[in-house]
Design a protein with these regions (language model features):
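Hydrophobic, lipid-facing positions within transmembrane beta-strands of outer-membrane proteins
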Residues: 56-62, 118-123, 170-174, 195-197, ...
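Repeated loop/turn-to-beta-strand initiation elements of outer-membrane beta-barrel proteins
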Residues: 70-74, 131-134, 182-186, 205-210, ...
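Outer-membrane beta-barrel "beta-signal"
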Residues: 306-308, 335-337, 343-344, 348-349, ...
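Transmembrane beta-strand segments of Gram-negative outer membrane beta-barrel proteins
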Residues: 21-45, 74-76, 182-186
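Detector for outer-membrane/organellar transmembrane beta-barrel domains
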Residues: 203, 228-321
Length: 375
């Protein structure tokens, strides 16, 4: 993949040098995310961490795009983050280790009290002509169809709890897409570890997609759909993984419904099933290894969400995740306020309880505030 990255970077310079009349666009944002953590005192004492701490993150994102003629374009996006607080200082729950490091990442500052990471999470060249689209480089390959948990998202799995990553991760890959007749399309995408094909078509007023892939050591077959049942949306996707070495088989699937009222209120509910979920670890939600086979650490997961614009500038909402195996509840209330056309304020919290000794015991609570300026 290093050769692919080298070729990509050289291609970017070639496009910029060979074509004098190139359209350049840019945008981005600057945000400050504060978090205040409150941990269960007994558990905190047992694992020898404080029961309260706070962290700060400053995030500058810069997106650039080049266009030449009708067929060629390129994109590069920089993600620059500064970290301070207890999680950075103590490398809490492997905080530093979780920061992705590769050829296009640079830890510019690694001091005891502060850290800075500069990451290129989009860097690709794209060619389009007629029904064809070819893209090479670090990109988002969004194959998920269900709202929350996506077993078809082989290249860029979403972490539901990482709400601050608005653009979501990218992957180094080559993707070829062809748009056929009658709302059909075919995609092929490959990188070092994944080779996959996706076919989309429409039938019975539903959009369907089929997936065939080699995903690390697994062969994958998948089916997904999206459509309407009366006025409610109905989506789902399932993937069947067969390990080429151990022959272990795993089914990962999710279904969901959503509904919007005329006053703007939005409801959504979904369920995720994993046939080979790992042994339960309540803190896997905090520090889990997200993948298409492991979008959540439990076998059965239920999510319910409601959003409502109480004012044209104010949106409130709440998400609830429930695991019935050990009766864990995760609640995530949220409020966003549009201060101006370019400045937004968000206040949110993530709270987790577990049923123990005939009562729900609080495990952890985190309060977030984020101020963001978009340019």
């Amino acid at each position: 993949m290093k050769n692919v990255k080298t070729l990509l970077i050289l291609s970017l310079f070639a496009i910029n040098g060979l074509f004098a009349q190139t359209v350049f666009e840019q945008d981005g944002y600057l945000s400050n995310l504060n978090s205040f953590q409150f941990f269960n005192k007994e558990i905190a004492s047992f694992i020898q961490i404080p029961d309260q701490w706070n962290d700060q993150q400053f995030h500058l994102r810069w997106n650039t795009r080049l266009y030449h003629g009708e067929h060629w374009s390129a994109k590069m996006s920089l993600r620059n983050r500064i970290f301070t607080g207890y999680s950075w200082e103590e490398n809490l729950f492997g905080f530093k280790d979780a920061l992705e490091v590769d050829v296009l990442d640079l830890t510019a500052i690694n001091e005891e009290k502060v850290g800075m990471q500069q990451q290129i999470d989009r860097l690709y060249v794209q060619w389009e002509r007629g029904n064809w689209n070819v893209r090479l480089g670090r990109q988002r390959i969004n194959w998920g169809i269900q709202n929350y948990w996506n077993s078809h998202d082989l290249f860029n799995q979403i972490n539901f709890f990482d709400f601050d990553y608005l653009e979501r991760p990218g992957s180094d890959a080559l993707r070829i897409q062809y748009y056929g007749k009658g709302n059909t399309s075919t995609q092929f995408a490959v990188n070092e570890n994944i080779q996959a094909g996706l076919y989309k078509f429409n039938a019975w007023d539903f959009d369907f997609q089929t997936l065939l892939a080699k995903y690390y050591n697994d062969y994958v077959l998948g089916l997904g759909w999206a459509g309407q049942i009366k006025e409610a949306g109905f989506k789902g996707e399932f993937a069947y993984f067969i390990n080429s070495e151990s022959q272990v088989k795993e089914l990962v699937g999710s279904i969901g419904i959503d509904y919007s009222l005329q006053n703007g209120m939005y409801f959504s509910s979904g369920c995720l099933y994993r046939s080979q979920a790992d042994d339960f670890n309540p803190f896997a939600l905090i520090n889990q290894d997200i993948s298409a086979k492991n979008p959540m650490p439990f076998a059965y997961n239920f999510l319910h969400q409601i959003n409502y614009p109480i004012h044209p500038l104010v949106l409130v909402g709440m998400s609830l995740i429930h695991n019935e195996e050990l009766d864990i509840i995760f609640i995530n209330p949220m409020l966003t306020y549009s201060i101006s056309e370019s400045i937004d304020l968000m206040i949110s919290s993530q709270n987790m309880w577990m049923w123990s000794d005939d009562t729900y015991e609080n495990l952890t609570q985190t309060v977030f505030t984020r101020l963001q300026w978009t340019f």
